């Protein structure tokens, strides 16, 4: 994740990223508790470093109910234009719903900090999710008050022929 973090003046969006290392590996039992549990500290230290260096971190947990997940999965199976979104492993993962929910709860509890808090966003309705996330981003940008960088020296007044 570190290699693809946004630089000064850039915005980056990550889908899951390093959180897979405390969610999937835990819910599926891929590594022992002693391994995934210490990763909370690793995540917090990494995000602390980013924050200390001036990165604004906005974390959104897009919370979809089990019933809505079932509806979306069925829609992906029934609609040929959405088949590409479905994979057989989704059904196996769905059977682990309680384990994933426990992992999500612990992840939020252990990695929500003053410098990188979690925002749990109700996401059964896309418009609600989109509005909530847009407001979070808009408020963050207003607070940051970004400015365009100055032009490169010597280009002022240049005319393209």
Where are these regions (language model features)?
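Short, surface-exposed amphipathic charged segments that create phosphate/polyanion-binding patches used
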Residues: 1-3, 75, 134-135
């Amino acid at each position: 994740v570190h290699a693809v973090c946004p630089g000064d003046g850039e915005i980056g969006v990550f889908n899951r990223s390093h959180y897979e290392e405390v969610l999937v590996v835990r819910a599926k039992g891929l590594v022992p508790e002693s391994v995934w549990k210490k990763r909370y500290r690793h995540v917090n230290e990494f995000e602390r470093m980013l924050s200390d260096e001036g990165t604004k971190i906005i974390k959104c947990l897009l919370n979809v109910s089990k019933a809505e997940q079932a509806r979306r999965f069925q829609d992906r199976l029934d609609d040929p234009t959405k088949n590409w979104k479905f994979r057989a492993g989704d059904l196996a993962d769905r059977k682990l719903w309680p384990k994933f929910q426990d992992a999500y709860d612990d992840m939020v509890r252990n990695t929500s900090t003053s410098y990188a808090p979690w925002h749990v966003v109700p996401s059964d309705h896309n418009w609600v999710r989109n509005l909530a996330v847009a407001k979070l981003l808009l408020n963050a940008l207003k607070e940051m008050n970004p400015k365009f960088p100055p032009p490169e020296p010597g280009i002022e007044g240049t005319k393209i022929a």
